[in-house]
């Protein structure tokens, strides 16, 4: 209750989605450029969600993991996730907050088998991440544009990964959600219809093919009973010429 909007922005600092950065940041960035232990990240996320007082990590690990593991903060969403850099050739994972070489790409990882993970007071079933991956495959078959998604298997767990579309060749891309642009809270249902969303898209001069893509997503969400289609899950990307485009679905 004491965590204000300003506190959240200061906590986000330079680690948020998109290109916006907030100063002064309330926490220092970890500059440790080393491989990340996925199992330890999952354990840390479970400890946070369980509100355990004793987390069995040393001070540096706590700093590193607390900046990587996002629980409903800068990466958005209700479930624990991490912003990572992944080397597909070696399968190594490093912090997604650091500048990385060309062998690494930026990804967002949603954890499997995290205690107390879920939304609206409901705890996820085991391997919920595989269900999300199945929806990704169905969306592709339906012509929905999405970033590359993978399943990262580790120690018997299957973590869902999606490649970040707000990072291109290591550079930040300006991104805003419909909720942020239209000042609409995703927590209040029925404040924004698909028709209203399309109207906002016309106001920022999205090309017609983006409007058509948005219509396809609307149909897919209805048919596939995806009820997570709120205003924070509709976003736009701006290029350096100031032109907006509909982001990939997520």
Question: What are the residue ranges of the model-derived segments?
Answer:
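Phosphate/dinucleotide-binding and metal-coordinating scaffold of catalytic cores
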Residues: 1-250
């Amino acid at each position: 209750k004491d965590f204000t909007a300003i506190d959240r922005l200061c906590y986000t600092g330079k680690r948020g989605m998109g290109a916006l950065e907030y100063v002064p940041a309330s926490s220092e960035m970890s500059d440790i450029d080393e491989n990340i232990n996925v199992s330890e990240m999952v354990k840390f996320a479970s400890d946070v969600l369980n509100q355990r007082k004793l987390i069995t990590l040393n001070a540096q690990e706590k700093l590193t993991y607390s900046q990587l593991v996002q629980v409903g903060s800068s990466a958005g969403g209700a479930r624990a996730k991490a912003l990572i850099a992944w080397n597909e050739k070696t399968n190594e994972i490093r912090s997604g907050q650091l500048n990385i070489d060309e062998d690494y790409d930026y990804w967002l990882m949603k954890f499997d088998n995290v205690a107390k993970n879920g939304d609206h007071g409901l705890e996820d079933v085991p391997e919920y991440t595989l269900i999300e991956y199945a929806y990704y495959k169905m969306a592709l078959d339906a012509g929905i544009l999405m970033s590359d998604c993978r399943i990262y298997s580790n120690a018997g767990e299957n973590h869902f990964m999606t490649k970040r579309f707000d990072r291109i060749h290591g550079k930040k891309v300006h991104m805003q959600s419909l909720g942020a642009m239209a000042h609409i809270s995703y927590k209040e249902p029925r404040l924004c219809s698909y028709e209203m969303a399309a109207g906002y898209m016309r106001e920022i001069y999205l090309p017609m093919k983006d409007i058509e893509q948005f219509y396809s997503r609307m149909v897919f969400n209805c048919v596939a009973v995806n009820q997570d289609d709120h205003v924070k899950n509709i976003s736009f990307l701006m290029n350096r010429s100031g032109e907006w485009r509909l982001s990939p679905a997520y």
